[in-house]
Amino acid sequence: MTHQTAVSSASPTNRSHHKPHYELIALPARSDNYIWLIRNQTHAWVVDPSLAEPVRDYIAQHGLTLADLLITHHHYDHVEGIVELAPWVQGRIIGDSERIHGLTERLHAPTEFTLSFSDVHAQVLSTPGHTYDHVSYYCPHLLQTPVLFCGDALFSAGCGRVFDGTMAQAFETIEQFIQLPDETLIACAHEYTLSNLDFALRIQSAHEATQAHLNQVKYARERGLPSLPSSIGLEKRINPFCRAVSIGLSTEPLDTAWIEGLNHLAQSVQLPAVSLANVDTREPNARKALALALFTLCRELKNRI
């Protein structure tokens, strides 16, 4: 059984009645979902309630009032708890899709808003790809570091499958994410980290940062602890999709060992390799086109493997 995990907003020395103390809680649900719960001493705010029971149990156990529900997209494993939790909600049920039933307020990107009964500011980010209307919620000052609630748009060492969005949209969403501060915490909705790291190491088995993180995640998971939240800085080092997208934003020499590993893996499952021939890496548009091609190949490979 996976246990809850908490990330705190304040050390004991800087907590006071002038600055509410917030915590970020990962509530396990279903086989691999996390329901993210923000709490202070009196209220709770919940992201993507895939089930009602874990939320109800937590707020009852801790004597909290359920303030808001924040929804990233319409898939059942992100919304199934809405109907049952709605009578408990004292604030709003927020999302940005007509396909999400039970919303009380639609907030369109790039809206900035404040969580009900709090001083926590959040931004709605348009993050399509996994679905065409997927959004994420960015809280720049929730904890001592920013927090990104990104649903299925980004996972630790991976990203969501492209369903009714497009590959270009998914690419641009990751491009948006990796330009956030490196210390930004990634609160994604699924515990896929081990399988994603295995995939990353099939591309480049000798990558030290990825191997080191795999060892850390195995240690945590063997003890029933979540591998999340991750961070933008970590994902830029270990996530194949972030590494591909980063090529389009960088002027550094290409990591040819990683690209060769990706192409070798592609050829092993009869997918065409991405050619570096005639790519002028000094030209920004050429680098971005290469980055998109590598990102697309990563996604097609992950779908197969």
Please provide the spans of the model-predicted regions.
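Accessory terminal helices/loops
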Residues: 2-11, 175-185, 194-305
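A short acidic, helix-capping loop that chelates divalent metal ions and anchors anionic groups
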Residues: 103, 157-163, 196
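Residue-level signal for inorganic ion chemistry
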Residues: 38, 48, 85, 152, ...
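Conserved beta-strand hairpin/beta-sheet module of binuclear metal-dependent hydrolase folds
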Residues: 14-64, 137-151
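Active-site HxH/HxHxD metal-binding segment of metal-dependent hydrolases
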Residues: 30-31, 44, 51-126, 145-146, ...
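Active-site-adjacent loop/tail segments of enzyme domains
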Residues: 158-184
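Core dinuclear metal-dependent hydrolase active-site scaffold
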Residues: 37-39, 112-143, 179
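Active-site metal-binding loops of divalent metal-dependent hydrolases
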Residues: 49-51, 74, 98, 130-131, ...
